[in-house]
């Protein structure tokens, strides 16, 4: 076994040396694209299509894992980002229905904010490497019709993107967002929620597991509703977090590797396995919608709802292989969340932050 923190380093070393390369690896789109232009994974399109014919994939998982009309890994499961809501705080403010749009979330968050008592509506940070909240803000941007790239891979950020910067800064200035949120890392949002400081938090279902597994959070759990994220004025596209299995191009028996992956997708075994790891990961097949594990449990159902709508990806809606690669690789330099941070902290206005972000992405684009 290899620790997750060591996996990529050891895999890269094996690939470079041409020795001890695994036949099958756990993969996702970002991991695959980071090897462009020398992607070391086989094209497994035929296997994915065969699986889809026998047991149809959710459309978002089927389309969202395709790279330049090919599959470099077989989709297996997906994580999600769910909305955790303090229902007791909403009730105290006279709010009787859960919000379904971003505008409603922001309005409700403003109503429940009480900064004098260190309570805030939104747990959305913009620290320098806060990838969790960058994904949330990016998704909000998509939902409002804003994009960093066009389909051809050109940087296409416009006034819809600056509107997102300005909205975040407005919420921050109005103290709907904690004032330390500009320094958060990826754990800042869920940390604030667990500490009872925030009413709305967008996080993986691991936050739900933390609430369930620790007795100290019993009251917080009882007052928490877990939902799929809201829709925007333009769409309700979610970021996809599909993962699966890739066959390396050094594999000497690709037929056997395909058989192993097919075995792991055997319906009975797969369904029982997914039941054990719910709701942190959700299935990627259409028939999951009729499975009681994912239909009758409210939190599991919301996780599956997320996966059903998770057709977005880094760079969405770019279609080209190089464009997808630039988007996937630039993500790890965080120019987007840095721009949000600049506007929130007043070190740049939205136009200046947009210009700086665009320049950073274009410089990176030239290196790919």
Model-derived features with residue positions:
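Extracytoplasmic "Venus flytrap"/periplasmic binding protein-like
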Residues: 1-57, 91-100, 192, 196-200, ...
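Beta->alpha turn/N-cap motifs
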Residues: 27-31, 186, 203-211
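Hinge/lid segment of periplasmic solute-binding proteins
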Residues: 28-80, 106, 132-136, 160, ...
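Extracytoplasmic/periplasmic solute-binding protein
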Residues: 70-76, 81, 103-154, 198
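Short glycine- and hydrophobic/aromatic-rich loop-to-beta-strand nucleating segment
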Residues: 81-85, 141, 245-247
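Short helix-loop capping/hinge motifs at secondary-structure junctions, enriched
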Residues: 88-98, 147, 174, 250-257
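Glycine-centered hinge/linker elements that transmit conformational signals in sensory
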Residues: 108-109, 152-182, 225, 229
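C-terminal lobe and pocket-closing loops
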Residues: 206-220, 233-335, 366
């Amino acid at each position: 076994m290899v620790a997750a923190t060591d996996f990529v380093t050891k895999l890269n070393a094996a690939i470079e040396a041409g020795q001890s390369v695994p036949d099958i690896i756990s993969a996702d789109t970002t991991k695959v694209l980071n090897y462009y232009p020398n992607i070391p994974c086989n094209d497994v399109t035929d296997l994915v299509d065969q699986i889809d014919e026998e047991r149809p994939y959710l459309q978002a998982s089927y389309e969202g894992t395709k790279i330049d009309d090919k599959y470099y890994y077989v989709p297996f499961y997906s994580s999600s980002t769910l909305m955790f809501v303090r229902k007791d705080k909403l009730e105290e403010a006279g709010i009787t229905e859960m919000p379904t749009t971003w505008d409603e979330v922001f309005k409700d968050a403003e109503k429940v904010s009480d900064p004098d008592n260190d309570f805030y509506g939104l747990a959305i940070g913009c620290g320098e490497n806060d990838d969790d909240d960058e994904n949330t803000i990016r998704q909000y941007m998509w939902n409002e019709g804003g994009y960093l790239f066009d389909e051809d891979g050109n940087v296409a950020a416009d006034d819809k993107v600056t509107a997102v910067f300005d909205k975040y800064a407005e919420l921050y200035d109005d103290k709907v967002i904690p004032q330390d949120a500009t320094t958060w890392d990826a754990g800042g949002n869920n940390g604030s929620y667990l500490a009872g400081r925030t009413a709305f938090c967008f996080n993986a279902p691991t936050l739900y597991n933390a609430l369930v597994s620790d007795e100290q959070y019993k009251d917080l759990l009882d007052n928490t509703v877990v939902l799929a994220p809201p829709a925007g004025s333009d769409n309700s596209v979610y970021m996809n977090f599909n993962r699966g299995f890739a066959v390396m191009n050094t594999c000497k028996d690709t037929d056997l590797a395909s058989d192993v992956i097919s075995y792991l997708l055997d319906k009975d075994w797969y369904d029982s396995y997914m039941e054990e790891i719910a709701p942190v990961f959700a299935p990627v097949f259409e028939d999951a919608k009729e499975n009681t594990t994912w239909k009758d449990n409210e939190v599991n159902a919301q996780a599956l709802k997320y996966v059903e709508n998770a057709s977005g990806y880094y760079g969405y809606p770019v279609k080209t292989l190089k464009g997808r690669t630039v988007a996937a690789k630039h993500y790890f330099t965080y120019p987007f969340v840095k721009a949000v941070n600049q506007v929130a902290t007043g070190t740049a206005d939205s136009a200046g932050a947009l210009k700086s972000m665009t320049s950073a992405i274009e410089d990176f684009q030239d290196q790919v």
